[in-house]
């Protein structure tokens, strides 16, 4: 049975046709020398990285949320392919969110695979904006981590969207809004644990007009600079961050995550544009799991990982620029320096804490309060005295080709008026 034509399929066709036309016309392309210079600059960024001593009692896990397999209608990815991709990207966990199909309960991977924790879930449609064509935006519900009480006979169509969200949560699952720019009814933001504040597939779709040039460069360089060309995907998600800040400023505890939305299905001119191993390295959601009282080097349990995500003890990082493992943002007692609140936590006690930031390499550090940049400096560490109660988060940037590029986006710490 032929698959339906999707926006992603249409995009691939447009790119393919444009790429062929440009090649036939002998169009110019980015010189290998420029891409080599870019590679050397990125290598210099990565070479300056240092190991940040971990916070006692916590472990930083690097992972990917929102990936698809052959159990989705728009991907042919096999388990061995995304497990290999996870190994290439040095992931600690992988959340699979196939478009809902009862087979995910039978055939879908779930559990421990060596050092990799795999958590199965599903993606459910949430409707689209009224626009048509490539400008149309469609949101989704990402549900994962639900227990065995949701059985293969579970039918999402039997519920309204609010009831579906409640059902997933009732069975122990986490619920996030995917493709959050497509959410047409703001009530959903108050029903879920969090939202994607970056989605790779959406960003690639928004940049589709520049893709023919991308594909020609990829083709003529024989894929030698695939990583360097995909650095163009890394952009600060201004609209989504502004939406997220409005929600948290209004008192909603909304956890921000990254959505890789990996399909490994975009092949143009015989070249696979989005292999799992590469898409898993562009963006990672790091989770700080609580391992206090445990000396075991074994991977923390799925429940411990999900608990940290639920609390918002996590941050996003564009790892293709530089590995951000070891990043720290916490509130500390100004007298002892002891951490008193981690990302996602609420603090309302006296005295008001200091905010501490540590990076694994020098970068621009920006303190954002209630959605507004309040302080910026360049360095590897920062101890900052907040100006008063508010919702504080951190963004970090790395300079590449004379421009500051988004690197790290933290979840907020909520300082209440009581402090």
What are the residue ranges of the model-derived segments?
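N-terminal secretory signal peptides and thylakoid transit peptides that target proteins
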Residues: 1-21
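Generic recognition of flexible, low-complexity loop/linker segments
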Residues: 83, 183-184, 243-245, 342-344, ...
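Residue-level preference for long, well-ordered alpha-helices that form the structural scaffold
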Residues: 157, 229, 233-236, 298-301
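C-terminal motif of bacterial Sec signal peptides marking the signal peptidase cleavage site
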Residues: 27-28
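Short glycine/proline- and acidic residue-enriched helix-loop micro-motifs
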Residues: 223-229
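C-terminal functional module detector
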Residues: 31-60, 72, 79, 250-256, ...
């Amino acid at each position: 049975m032929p698959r339906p034509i999707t926006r992603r399929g249409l995009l691939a066709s447009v790119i393919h046709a444009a790429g062929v036309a440009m090649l036939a016309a002998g169009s110019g392309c980015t010189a290998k020398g420029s891409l080599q210079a870019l590679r050397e600059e990125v290598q210099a960024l990565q070479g300056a990285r240092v190991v940040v001593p971990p916070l006692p009692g916590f472990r930083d896990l690097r992972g990917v949320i929102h990936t698809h397999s052959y159990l989705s209608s728009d991907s042919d990815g096999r388990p061995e392919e995304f497990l290999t991709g996870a190994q290439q990207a040095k992931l600690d966990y992988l959340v699979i969110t196939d478009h809902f199909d009862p087979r995910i309960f039978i055939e879908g991977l779930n559990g421990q695979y060596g050092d990799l924790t795999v958590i199965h879930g599903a993606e459910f449609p949430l409707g689209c904006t009224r626009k048509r064509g490539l400008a149309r935006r469609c949101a989704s519900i990402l549900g994962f981590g639900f227990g065995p009480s949701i059985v293969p006979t579970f039918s999402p169509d039997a519920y309204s969207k609010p009831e579906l969200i409640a059902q997933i949560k009732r069975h122990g699952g986490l619920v996030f809004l995917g493709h959050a720019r497509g959410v047409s009814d703001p009530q959903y933001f108050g029903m879920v644990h969090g939202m994607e504040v970056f989605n790779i597939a959406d960003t690639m779709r928004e940049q589709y007009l520049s893709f023919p040039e991308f594909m020609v460069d990829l083709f003529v360089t024989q894929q030698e600079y695939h990583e360097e060309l995909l650095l163009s995907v890394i952009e600060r998600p201004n609209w989504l961050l502004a939406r997220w800040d409005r929600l948290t400023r209004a008192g909603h505890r909304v956890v921000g995550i990254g959505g890789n939305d990996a399909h490994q299905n975009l092949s143009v001119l015989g070249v696979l544009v989005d292999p799992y191993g590469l898409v898993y390295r562009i963006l990672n959601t790091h989770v700080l799991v609580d391992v206090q009282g445990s000396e075991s080097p074994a991977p923390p349990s799925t429940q411990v990982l999900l608990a940290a995500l639920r609390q918002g003890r996590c941050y996003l990082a564009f790892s293709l620029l530089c590995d951000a493992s070891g990043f720290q943002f916490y509130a500390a007692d100004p007298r002892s320096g002891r951490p008193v609140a981690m990302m996602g936590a609420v603090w309302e006690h006296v005295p008001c804490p200091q905010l501490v930031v540590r990076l694994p390499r020098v970068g621009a550090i920006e303190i954002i309060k209630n959605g507004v940049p309040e302080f910026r400096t360049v360095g590897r560490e920062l101890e900052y005295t907040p100006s008063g109660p508010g919702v504080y988060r951190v963004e970090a940037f790395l300079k590449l080709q004379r421009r500051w590029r988004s690197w790290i986006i933290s979840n907020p710490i909520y300082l209440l008026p009581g402090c």
